[in-house]
Amino acid sequence: IRLSLVGSEMCIRDSTHITSSVQAGKGLWVCTYYRGIEYLDIATGKFTHYNKSTVPALPSEQTWTATEAEDGKLYIGHVEGGLSILSLNDKSVKHFVHDPQNPNSLPGNDVRCIYKDTNGNIWIGTSKGLALFNANTETFTNFHNNPGNIHGALSSYIFSIKQLKDNKLWIATELNGIMILDLQQNQFLLPEQIRFEFIREGDNNYSLSNASARYIFQDSFNNIWIGTWGGGINFISNAPPAFHTWSYS
């Protein structure tokens, strides 16, 4: 990825190993594997650096993802380093990691994706499954089991979380396909009562071409595109026929 801006403090191409980029208002958050996070003001072309030099309390400069909330907090997912919540006002940091003795701690320390839904809830995708962050108590609601699910635990590595237009949360996982959560359940049921739907790997037109899903996108026509690892792109049409697969060589 390259972005050259005349007169800017740096170019994104100088930050090796970009892991993700997320638009936020009039700017762009760019996460890197080795050099923390950069914020690009698109109007001015100016970069603001968030690393150990500018934010000494930051536990690690290895980052997968970042999501900005309305309260001026930046949620940062680290490479095997847990979750950090950075106050953009005073640069204070709160850091969370997995505690095997605490069932309400972060489920896994490799935080690959963070998603803010339309109700402002913060969902965390980790190497050990899905969690919902409770800002008031600074604890995590973890989703480990699916009632009545013959496939067992929900502790898959999670790569992507998206809320689609039907108010359902679609979750791309490693080897577990797509997990689907109806967000209305979250308002009325206990975590252990919540049921997930699944789209799994199979040989029919209603299954994924590969169980390792990486990315989910819903286009303006309400079609759903799913990127997989080794199985090409899967396309779920808003109108029949439902499934298509594009392979590559």
Placement of each model-derived feature along the sequence:
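Carboxylate-rich, polar loop motifs that coordinate divalent cations or form catalytic acidic clusters
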Residues: 2, 8-249
